[in-house]
Every structure is written in C-alpha cells, then in structure tokens.
Design a protein with these regions (language model features):
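Conserved small/polar residues in nucleotide/adenosyl-binding loops
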Residues: 213-220
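Acidic/polar, low-complexity intrinsically disordered N-terminal segments immediately downstream
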Residues: 1-89, 93, 97-99, 111-117, ...
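Short, surface-exposed beta-strand/loop "edge" segments at domain boundaries and coil↔beta transitions
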Residues: 58-60, 129-131, 164-168, 203-212
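N-terminal glycine/threonine-rich, aromatic-flanked beta-hairpin/loop signature
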Residues: 169-212
Length: 220
C-alpha cells in the first residue's frame, strides 16, 4: 500500500443477493483478507496461520509520519475496549492450497468517520508453528485503512463549488472575500451512515498535502 498503509473499501452494510442484511444489521460488514503461502511449490500440508493485532507497528508509523502532530494520527480500530473490528486469531490453509481468506468483521455503528481508522495486523511467528512468517515486514504485516461506502459516497465534481477566503471585514461588519474562488476538480464524500455522507470544506481533504520549498540565500 501507499507508504505502508493499504486502502480497503467495504460496504457500510453488507447485504446478501436478496438485499437482506448479511452480517446482522445496518452498519455491520465484513472483508475477506487473503493470506498466502509462498514458495516455489504448492503447499504440501495443512498450515494453521496465526494472526494478531499489531499496535506497535502502527505506533511507529504514526510517529515516523506525523511526529508530535497526534491529531493527524491513524486511529486503531482494534484497540482494546473498541468493538469496531474482530477476526479469528487463526486460519487453516489446507494442503494443496496456497491461499486462505481471513474473515474480518466490522461494526461501523456509532464510529466517528472523520477519524482515519485502520486495522493493524501481523502474522505471528512461533517455534511450535509449522510455518515461518515472511522475513520482509511488508509481507507479514498489514495496516489496513478501512473505507466504508454507501450508495452516495465517492468522488463528485467540485468545479461548481465556490470556495472563497475571508480576508477581513468592512465597516459594517460584512466579510471581505477574495475575488477568485478556490476550486478543486473533485471532492470526496465519506460515509456517516447508510444514508448520509460528509465532505471536507474547501480544498482540504484527508490526504491534502502542502509542500514548502526553501532556497538558500547569500550571507550578508
């Protein structure tokens, strides 16, 4: 994924083929995460893969990327005391198969979608297991950025939206705005619930980046 984080898109509510809730009700969903057995030949025996929460890697990534700007940190869906995500701690991959699907369950009810929610996972190593986790960290660990979607979320054209900057106020207290509108080619709608989305104001978005450049100046 981009910079160590993989975007995962799941429906806000999972439905079956008849349109009924498939995971117990509105705001509940799931995602089947592929787990692979690597090697030059097919997997010769049953392998029970053990999966665990990985708060340490998320903490390292947050500090490396944002340092003391804790308001920008990714939030951990799997943190103790939260019920937004669950998953089995082990997965059986049968002999002759090279892939298993770990069933991640999500409960989006009452979650604050303005936060950047992720689920950090890792494949666990132990001498008693009949496998070895891949030595490359990005093969044995995953930080999943969870994006729920509904019928209204996604990208919309932003060319018709007017965004002006207030530079001051006149003598009557009316705002003085810039003549030109700050435009953005598209805006993204993020899920609140089954029928509701929100967007970020102006040109700012979750992944908005401002680059500052400096040039050396001659000494006096």
């Amino acid at each position: 994924g981009s910079k160590g984080v993989t975007n995962i898109y799941v429906p806000y509510s999972r439905h079956d083929a008849e349109g009924n809730y498939a995971e117990g009700g509105e705001g509940r969903s799931n995602y089947q995460l592929p787990i692979l057995v690597s090697g030059s030949t097919d997997n010769p025996s049953n392998v029970t893969v053990h999966v665990a929460h990985d708060a340490d890697t998320l903490n390292i990534l947050n500090y490396a990327r944002y340092a003391t700007r804790t308001e920008l940190y990714y939030e951990d869906m799997g943190a103790e005391g939260l019920a937004y995500a669950s998953y089995p701690e082990s997965l059986l991959i049968k002999a002759g198969e090279n892939k298993g699907l770990l069933d991640l369950k999500f409960d989006f009810r009452n979650i604050d979608m303005s936060e950047k929610w992720v689920l950090p996972l890792q494949i666990v190593d132990d001498a008693s297991y009949n496998y070895v986790a891949h030595p490359r960290k990005d093969y044995a660990k995953a930080i999943l950025r969870i994006f729920p979607f509904n019928d209204y979320s996604g990208d919309y054209s932003g060319t018709g939206i007017t965004n002006k900057v207030v530079t001051g106020y006149d003598g009557d207290g009316k705002p003085i705005e810039t003549a030109e509108s700050i435009t953005k080619s598209s805006i993204r709608g993020y899920v609140i619930d089954e029928q509701t989305i929100f967007t970020y104001a102006g040109i700012v978005d979750e992944d908005y980046t401002c680059l500052l450049y400096t040039s050396p100046s001659p000494r006096d």
